[in-house]
């Protein structure tokens, strides 16, 4: 079973979602925490990054940027950090959201050094 760690930014995104979308996100989180090998329709590696995306479709395309803490490979990882989420409108959204995820990760890393 995986341990999912939620960032403040993820929690802010999650709480802003309509209840039906929150339910779907929670369902997806349950799947990735309990099932080791997850279909790429749900979790996919983001090209040229250290991140993965959790893919949720409820009318709109919702994405959550994930980071595997203890292993580079999602399947092997036991600690997953949920960094931030967004509504995907175009592929251009990814660059901005990946930069935001990097900033969150750097901030969390700096906090853990103290």
Where are these regions (language model features)?
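Conserved catalytic cores of phosphodiester-cleaving nucleases, focusing on short active-site segments
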Residues: 83
């Amino acid at each position: 079973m995986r341990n999912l760690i939620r960032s403040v930014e993820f929690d802010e995104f999650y709480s802003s979602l309509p209840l039906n979308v929150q339910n779907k996100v929670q369902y997806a989180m349950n799947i990735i925490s309990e099932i080791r090998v997850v279909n790429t329709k749900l979790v996919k590696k983001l090209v040229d990054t250290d991140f993965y995306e959790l893919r949720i479709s409820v009318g709109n395309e919702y994405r959550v940027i994930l980071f595997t803490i203890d292993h580079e490979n999602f399947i092997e990882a036991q600690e997953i950090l949920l960094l931030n989420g967004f509504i995907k409108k175009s592929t251009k959204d990814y660059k901005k959201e990946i930069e935001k995820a990097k900033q969150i990760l750097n901030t969390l890393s700096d906090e853990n050094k103290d």
